[in-house]
Amino acid sequence: MKKILFFVLCTLSLGSLSAQSLLTPEQLAKRERHKNLTVKEWNTDSKAKTRWMDRLKVYDSQGRCVEEIEYATYGQKWRVVSKYDDITGKVTEEIEYNDRNRPVRIKKYEWNADGTKAKQYNYLPNGKLYSVKVYEYIFSDK
């Protein structure tokens, strides 16, 4: 039992180290600055001088954006909640909500071994797949 637990812990720690090695120093520095951060963007009407929140971004303890909300003068326009893979640190799912906080779109992602996006699956709120986006990367020597 102890051997299995040790193996699992080693695998998880190596996975997190390999995920960190995929990130550039700039990306790591950006994530470090965003740990447990909430960013609020405010707008002010030039005539009435009324102020309202335009956008809200919430970052988790690892500096990843887990929620983003867009507002208008009347309230929430939309909201996106992101879920990440614990090992790779890449986005695995995004759920978009409307102004009534009801899901309107679900996106699930697959990633290539080199860290580039491979596929994006788009689902309706009822879970039915309605489209797939495939990413193709073409490098040319010019």
Residue positions per predicted region:
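Bacterial Sec-dependent N-terminal signal peptides
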Residues: 1-23
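Buried hydrophobic residues that stabilize the cores of well-folded domains
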Residues: 20-142
